[in-house]
Amino acid sequence: MAKKSKIVKNDRRRATVARYAERRAELKEIIRSPRSTPEQRTAAQNELAHQPRDASAVRVRNRDAVDGRPRGHLRKFGLSRVRVRELAHAGQLPGVRKASW
């Protein structure tokens, strides 16, 4: 079980990312666009640099939905590998079967 503070901090980061996502996308488009002038590009880079660090999506950590475990996360289930194994053995994951070949 992860510390509650780490889970809350990650949730706060998700909210910050969502709040700044649209403006970040606009600024990045200006920076990437060959049609933007060097002044526009510099202004966009400056504004992007002055946004909070946590506004970047790469700072959000994928965590287990049940206990917040940060490692071994499987996106398909939103759970850690440990939790997937436990739930699969208990038959609580629909469509998941133990491999046999």
From Swiss-Prot:
Xref: InterPro entries: Ribosomal_uS14, Ribosomal_uS14_bac/plastid
Domain of life of the organism encoding this protein: Bacteria
GO MF entry, a single one: structural constituent of ribosome
Alphabetical keyword list: Ribonucleoprotein, Ribosomal protein, RNA-binding, rRNA-binding
GO biological process, any: translation
GO cellular component: small ribosomal subunit
Start-end of Polar residues biased regions: 34-45
NCBIfam families named among the record's database cross-references: PRK08881.1
Assembly, per entry: Part of the 30S ribosomal subunit. Contacts proteins S3 and S10.
Record's function text: Binds 16S rRNA, required for the assembly of 30S particles and may also be responsible for determining the conformation of the 16S rRNA at the A site.
Protein family: Belongs to the universal ribosomal protein uS14 family.
Family matches, as PANTHER family: 30S RIBOSOMAL PROTEIN S14 (PTHR19836), SMALL RIBOSOMAL SUBUNIT PROTEIN US14A (PTHR19836:SF23)
Protein name per the record: Small ribosomal subunit protein uS14A
Lineage per the UniProt record: Bacteria, Bacillati, Actinomycetota, Actinomycetes, Mycobacteriales
